[in-house]
Every structure is written in structure tokens, then in C-alpha cells.
Amino acid sequence: MRGLDYKWIEALDAVVAQGGFERAAEELYISQSAVSQRIKQLERFLAQSVLIREQPPKPTPVGKKLLGLYRRVRILEHELIPELMNDDTAKPIQLALATNADSLATWLLPALKEVMTQRQVELNLAIYGESRSIEKLKSGEVAGAISLESQPIAGCKADYLGRMDYVCVASPDFYQRYFAAGVNYQTLRKAPAVSYDQYDDLHNRFLHDHFNISRDSIINHNVGSSEAFVRLAVSGIAYCLIPKLQIEQELASGVLMDITPGFLLSYRIYWHHWQLESGVLKEISQAIVQYAQAHLPL
């Protein structure tokens, strides 16, 4: 865009990332009034607002597009300049990726191990629900996202990773306490279950599809940890939908049991990333796709 000063967008990025004008000024080593002036210059240039001035400040839809552009340029710049200057002392490149909790708890870290140990990179693995992570890529907050969405957004690719199979499990003791009469509409409404957060609809969808039970008809804990799901189930506190990949040993040993045999919840997941990638970003995408396709059911 002719006439667009990237210092203006840098100020916008700092305000959003730091949660306010004062901390943005500290980050940029300029005065708070200078930060405000740069934002105003950007809005004057575009003839529209780029920032919702609340606490904390949030970008408008136009602001999100600008931040996406700016962050892509920064990543490419970070990789290209040290190469052009033959500089081996550059700081690690900082990358944010959006993932669902279950992928992080099972296969994602092994997929990224080689890149994380052999390249100068600092990763921020931000956890979002499978249906929400794509929004973070749209806004430019992350450079890649694991999502249930198969269609890529503009300027991006969507590579199929594989299938996540979920099993509804409980401990034998829990099963005897709550499901001695069988797993059905009546018993499921009295047994405590677990969801990740208010956005997690996997469990509710499973109960609705197979038992015609609505969300407000069950006892449901919210626990924001995939690893805690396993502990809750093993401890006999609740029954849970857990990725089969995560509990193969527990199922084999009988510590956990499949309480709805024949009913499997499966989701196809995709890796969304920019079409034009190079350097460590390209390596990350290749590592994720290759590892997932080798270890997840297709």
C-alpha cells in the first residue's frame, strides 16, 4: 500500500500485544502520546478505525488484516536479513501456532521436536478449540493453526493431517456406581462428565447424536487440561471423551474401559498455514504434516 508507514502498524501491534498504550510505549521506547499519534495517523490514512478503544484494546476487522500483514512481514524479515548479512548471532524467531489441547497432549510435540531442537525458534503454542483456532490465523495472531475446517482461508493452505478418534471412557469403579443398569438416557443424565471449556462441544455432540441428550440435562465439569481428563477418569471422578491415542495403555490394562463400545467420535483435522512459506515456517509445516499423517489414522 503506497504511503503506508509500517511504524504505524508497529504501534498498533504493540498496543494489541501489550494490552494498552502505556505498555506499548515501553515496548517501543517512545512516549505514550507518540504511540497514540501513530495510531491516529494510520486511521487518518485509511479513513477508518483500526482499534476498538476498550480495556484491553482490540483491533477492528481492518486492524486485524493489517496485523496479519505486518506479522507475516516481520517473520519473513527475521529470516531473510540474517541470511543476507551472514549473521549467525540473530535472536530466535518467535512464532505463534494455534492448536487444540488434544493434539498438544498427544502427537504435536513429538512432531515439532526436531525443529525445536535444531533451529533458533521460540514457539508460542496457544490452545484454542478446534473450531476457533482458524480465527486466530485470520487475524494474523498465529502463523499456523490446527482446525476442523477443511477449506483454507485466502492466502493459506489446508493440509489434511488425519483423524482424531475419541473414546467415551470411565474407570470400572465409576461404571459400577453409575452405569450398573447400562449406559442410557437415564443413567447418563446422573453421571458427572467433563468438557474442556464452554466452547468445547465434543462431549455434548456425542451425547446428542447417540443418546438424544442436551447439554443442560447433564452434570458437566469444565477442566482446561487434556491430561487432567485422564486423571479424572482414572480416579473415578467422571467419565470423559478422550483421544484413543492418549489412553491406549489405560484401555489395554483395564484401568479405563470403553463404556459405549461401537460408538466412536471421529474428527478430521487440518493444518492451516500460509501459502508462501520459507525457512523455519516451512520446516514446521512439513514436520507437522509428515508426522501427523504417519501417526494418526487416515
Curated annotation (Swiss-Prot):
Which InterPro entries does UniProt cross-reference here?
ArgP, ArgP_gammaproteobact, LTTR, LysR_subst-bd, Tscrpt_reg_HTH_LysR, WH-like_DNA-bd_sf, WH_DNA-bd_sf
Residue ranges of the HTH lysR-type domain? 4-60
Keyword Metal-binding: yes or no? no
Q: Which residues bind DNA?
A: 21-40
The record's GO molecular-function terms, alphabetically, read:
DNA binding; DNA-binding transcription factor activity
In terms of PROSITE patterns, this protein maps to: HTH_LYSR
Q: Which CDD domains match?
A: PBP2_IciA_ArgP
The protein's UniProt keywords, in alphabetical order, are: DNA-binding, Transcription, Transcription regulation
Question: Which NCBIfam families did the record assign?
Answer: argP (TIGR03298), PRK03635.1 (NF002964), PRK13348.1 (NF009888)
User: How would you summarize the oligomeric state and partners of this protein?
Assistant: Homodimer.
Family classification: Belongs to the LysR transcriptional regulatory family.
Q: What does this protein do?
A: Controls the transcription of genes involved in arginine and lysine metabolism.
Specify the protein name.
HTH-type transcriptional regulator ArgP
